[in-house]
């Protein structure tokens, strides 16, 4: 998906926050104000979003993993849907402290979740008492809510895509500590500090959030497809080389 200026206008990407809540570090990306609301300069946003998507394409073409993060109410369902569509890990409920910096411990909880899911599939759950089964279901639901989106993630992600960097401050701090690049949607009331690829824009409108997340998911799918195509081309090239050798040997 190639994002256009018109699409951004229709999604309300240009609407920032009230001027009294602004963060001066976002000044370079602000076009002006209307009715005491800052207006984001979409010419900057378009260029910066495309740079972020190019980065995502290159990363996933090289088999990199991008973690989607968006736990605010407006973003939860959208983040989950788009991450699932492109096969990316995601966090759309509460960000658990240490999710990145203490991934070894988190991995143990993921293993517990996977073991519990196996118990459901193999019928072990049927052997539990009513109280045990109820406790089991509660724990399973809790683990699924917090870790379900990252249960297939084998290690730390190569990058992180974040909706609303202010709301996800803990995630940004952890990524920064570990040197994990962040692609982040930054509204006029937040600081772009710690964000490698800043996408200035509205982080409250569900239409705007859908536009960012869909564009990122498309870029990931394009990158993966590019990787597959390169493997196919390399395979064809190898076959041609081998075929040429066989013909030479037979001559």
Swiss-Prot record:
Q: Which UniProt keywords apply?
A: Ribonucleoprotein, Ribosomal protein
Gene Ontology terms: cellular component: cytosolic small ribosomal subunit
The answer, when asked if NAD is one of the entry's keywords, is no
Q: What one GO molecular function would you report for this record?
A: structural constituent of ribosome
Q: Which domain of life is it from?
A: Bacteria
Would I find Ribonucleoprotein among this entry's keywords? yes
What InterPro entries would the database entry show?
Ribosomal_uS2, Ribosomal_uS2_bac/mit/plastid, Ribosomal_uS2_CS, Ribosomal_uS2_flav_dom_sf
What's one GO BP annotation on this UniProt entry?
translation
Q: Which family does it belong to?
A: Belongs to the universal ribosomal protein uS2 family.
PANTHER family membership: 30S RIBOSOMAL PROTEIN S2 PROKARYOTIC AND ORGANELLAR, SMALL RIBOSOMAL SUBUNIT PROTEIN US2M
Protein name according to UniProt: Small ribosomal subunit protein uS2
Organism of provenance: Nitrosomonas europaea (strain ATCC 19718 / CIP 103999 / KCTC 2705 / NBRC 14298)
Lineage of the organism: Bacteria, Pseudomonadati, Pseudomonadota, Betaproteobacteria, Nitrosomonadales
């Amino acid at each position: 998906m190639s994002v256009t200026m018109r699409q951004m206008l229709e999604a309300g990407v240009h609407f920032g926050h009230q001027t009294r809540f602004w963060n001066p570090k976002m000044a370079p990306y602000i076009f002006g104000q209307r009715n005491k609301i800052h207006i984001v300069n979409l010419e900057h946003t378009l260029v910066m979003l495309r740079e972020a998507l190019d980065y995502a394409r290159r990363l996933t073409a090289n088999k990199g993993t991008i973690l989607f993060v968006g736990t605010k109410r407006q973003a939860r369902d959208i983040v989950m849907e788009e991450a699932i569509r492109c096969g990316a890990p995601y966090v759309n409920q509460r960000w658990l402290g240490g999710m990145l910096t203490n991934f070894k411990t988190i991995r143990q909880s993921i293993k517990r979740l996977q073991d519990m899911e196996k118990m459901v599939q193999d019928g072990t759950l049927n052997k539990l008492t009513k109280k045990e089964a109820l406790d089991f279901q509660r724990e399973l639901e809790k683990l699924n809510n917090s870790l379900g989106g990252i249960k297939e993630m084998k290690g730390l992600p190569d990058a992180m895509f974040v909706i609303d960097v202010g709301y996800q401050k803990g995630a940004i701090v952890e990524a920064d500590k570990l040197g994990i690049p962040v692609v982040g949607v930054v509204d006029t009331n937040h600081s772009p500090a710690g964000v490698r690829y800043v996408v200035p824009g509205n982080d409250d409108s569900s239409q705007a959030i859908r536009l960012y997340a869909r564009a990122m998911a498309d870029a990931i799918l394009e990158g993966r497809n590019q990787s597959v195509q390169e493997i196919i081309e390399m395979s064809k090239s190898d076959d041609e080389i081998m075929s040429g050798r066989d013909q030479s040997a037979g001559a």
